[in-house]
Amino acid sequence: MSTVINGRELADQMQAEIQKDVEKMTQQGIQPGLVVLLVGENPASQTYVRNKERAAAKIGILSKVEKLPETISEEELLAEIDKYNQDSRFHGILVQLPLPKHIDEEKILLAIDPKKDVDGFHPMNLGRLFVGKPEMIPCTPYGIMKMFEAYDIDLTGKRAVVIGRSNIVGKPMAQLLLMKNATVTIAHSKTEHLAEVAKEADILVVAIGRGHFVTKEFVKPGAVVIDVGMNRNQEGKLIGDVAFDEVSEIASYITPVPKGVGPMTITMLMYQTVEAAKKQK
């Protein structure tokens, strides 16, 4: 049986540390601030934003959610971003994705001041990460790296396979693993013989967005398995991309869904907001 990596517990420990940091800063007259721009009524987005608000309130970060209509024009949204770029009360700006079809996501992310891009999605921040000089790092892969650290999982010389190639998880995850001297393969839905490729991995990170897609046929016994998936099954239950029950029988470490990667993503968002406040003061 695997050791289950408890993301909720680790997130709580880290948030307690961040809270101490915020208390010190507040005594010096600096309160870290985060603004979230939420466009439309997407229920999943609303849940994520509520979780972010809750974490910010617990830690002592000033947080504001700017709810904007689904019909907002690109120009109006760009004007909102510009307003918060100029507002010194807010050290972090986050645009909750996905955006409505009529808005160019890339253009919106480019408009955020890179110093306030606490999600780490701005091309300048991704570029810094890829030349090995990171400033703001996408929060999900960053949180996963903290999990490896907390559980003393050594990455040097290990074979790592990342299933998923998004700019939010897959590509930055591969780069962070590379920076820790892992040998990295990026696979995806079009990879031939995907199960065989995955089975080579000592470290398997799955972010493909398909419920219970990775079964034990994909996993080498003793591998570390990180599940980034957030899917709903037919009963509406939250499930990961990995078939937890069967894979946990052969993996050495595994993250559950829920209470795995999700809480760490939010924690790293809070951490980067506080770090941004320190740099901007």
Curated annotation (Swiss-Prot):
Record keywords, A-Z: Amino-acid biosynthesis, Histidine biosynthesis, Hydrolase, Methionine biosynthesis, Multifunctional enzyme, NADP, One-carbon metabolism, Oxidoreductase, Purine biosynthesis
One Gene Ontology molecular-function label: methenyltetrahydrofolate cyclohydrolase activity
Cellular component terms (Gene Ontology): cytosol
Known pathway: One-carbon metabolism; tetrahydrofolate interconversion
EC annotation from Swiss-Prot or TrEMBL: 1.5.1.5, 3.5.4.9
UniProt cross-references to InterPro entries, sorted A to Z: Aminoacid_DH-like_N_sf, NAD(P)-bd_dom_sf, THF_DH/CycHdrlase, THF_DH/CycHdrlase_cat_dom, THF_DH/CycHdrlase_CS, THF_DH/CycHdrlase_NAD-bd_dom
Coiled-coil residue spans: none
Binding site for NADP(+): 164-166, 189
GO biological process: L-histidine biosynthetic process; methionine biosynthetic process; purine nucleotide biosynthetic process; tetrahydrofolate interconversion
HAMAP family from the UniProt entry: THF_DHG_CYH
Function of the molecule: Catalyzes the oxidation of 5,10-methylenetetrahydrofolate to 5,10-methenyltetrahydrofolate and then the hydrolysis of 5,10-methenyltetrahydrofolate to 10-formyltetrahydrofolate.
Recorded family membership: Belongs to the tetrahydrofolate dehydrogenase/cyclohydrolase family.
Subunit structure, as described in the record: Homodimer.
Protein name per UniProt: Bifunctional protein FolD
Lineage: Bacteria, Bacillati, Bacillota, Bacilli, Lactobacillales
